[in-house]
Swiss-Prot record:
Listed transmembrane segments: none
GO aspect biological process, one term: negative regulation of translation
Subunit structure: Part of the 50S ribosomal subunit.
Purpose: This protein is one of the early assembly proteins of the 50S ribosomal subunit, although it is not seen to bind rRNA by itself. It is important during the early stages of 50S assembly.
UniProt xrefs under NCBIfam families: rplM_bact
Protein name (record): Large ribosomal subunit protein uL13
Amino acid sequence: MARYFPVQKTTMIKPEEVERKWYVVDASGKVLGRLATRIAKILMGKHKPNYTPHVDTGDYVIVVNADKVVLTGKKLDQKVYYWHSGYPGGLKSLTARQMLEKHPERLIWLAVKRMLPKNRKGRKMLKRLKVYASPEHPHQAQKPEPIEL
């Protein structure tokens, strides 16, 4: 005996149908990892009901006051960021405290970068992240919405 099961179609958004918004996030007093996960979700577009895995549906995120971000525990002195210059003996390192003093934007940028996909789509998403150490940013013309994370 055949039964009728209604078929529901999953909506798949096309790249040209994506509407992007601008959001501004104040990082002062926020924990780095928790802030970075929420920013990564917005960049990927997972906060939207029409999220489609194979299409980049994310929005733009402006982070201000990056120098006032908080790290819990002893991470300021124990967490070390490494990179290599490409030359023999060129391993460089900075602790999180030194990074926060010298390059506070890079601290948030790296945390978000490592949470995004490691492919072309992830690199494209990362270009929509704008991080500033001060409360001012040059994106007022885009009329960004303040968002509380």
